Amino acid sequence: MTQDTAPIPRLAGLSAEASGPPDPSGLGPLCFFWSHPERGLRVRAYGEALRREAGAGGLGALLSALSRADGITWLDGPADARPRPPGPWFGAVAFDPPRAAWSGFAPIRFAVPRLLVWDGAGRRHVAVFAPEKDATRASLQSALDEARRSLDGRFGDTIRNSPVARAAAVQDGRARWAGLVDLALERIRSSELRKVVIARAMDVPAGPPVDALLQHLERAYPQCRTFHLRGDGGAAFVGSTPESFCSLEGRQLHTEALAGSALPAEAQELLRRPKDLREHEWVVDHIAGALRDISESVEVPASPAVRELATVAHLHTPISARLHSGAGLAEVVAALHPTPAVGGVPSAAAVRFLGEHEKLDRGLYAGLIGLVGPSRAELAVALRCARIAGGTARLFLGAGIVEGSSAESEWMETQLKARALLDALEAA
């Protein structure tokens, strides 16, 4: 992969209110989709006006550049005179560098759309973007007018990048899973690890279009962030994640710990299970401790609550912080990624264990996905997700291993987590 080293040019933007159907057609290929119904937010990004990619060593500098406060010149007046669009940079950060199976997805990639359509606070807006050096008010106004005409007059959907369907799943072997769990427990008993999150894959033959899958997920999981990132060549990375990595506005940060899982019918039992409470406490302590190094203040509730989803329940603790004046998104990502909810405790030892023994090309799974813009970001941990390409949807399923875990119970937990996408595939 070639890393972009050129400075990121300032952007020019133009926005307006709009109307039309929820999923309009005629706007070109949909490159990114983001829906969080609980917050009333829905985003669709079309085309690319600008893209930047980086290797792991360039992540901090890239995030700092994307989130700088003066990154956009609005040609229709001051930014505070209108609702600000999410982002507008959209993209993802891989858990580990994607290999051949992830062709079309760079390890770190963010892009500005040519056209952004978003619903929020009960209203719809549209914005167009271009590098400032290439933009004029007339050219952006023409693009904006054309987009508004398409929004007003066309119906249908534009998320038909790759087909998916439910069928008999091809899964990683249970014997290999059991061996990996046993090895993890050996390292835990030797005190090398306290927790490690191991993952496996499930392959499902392709069938219905991705748009139907996304629409089912956002209806079934309004508390989650349903996402779609189009890869080069038409591959798709889709999911509906329950875990926010960060919501950043200026220096105010909101994040969360999500660890400990059960069937919805057993949700309240999570508050009485020592194994799940212990696992959750380690995640909370790690996140809060990492944030204290870059924050003026960190607020953590005294005890967790339960978050119930349609197919699974989790222990949940919201965490908020006010960053030091010199800290921003780059420092937050450096401090928290990967969290113990997807790596383990201690973090470095857990990630090393996974690299040596998991033998799974995680790619974007368990990485970060979302939107970045001037002095703000909305990023989630990419969970409950699948890579869709070549007629196959590969689902990624993980479970946290701690003292007291068993291979059988953790396998069943991953089966439980698979239901979100499998049910959506069947409904689609």
Identify the residue ranges that each predicted region occupies:
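A glycine-rich phosphate-binding loop feature that marks nucleotide/adenosyl-phosphate handling sites
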Residues: 200-203, 231-237, 287-288, 304-312, ...
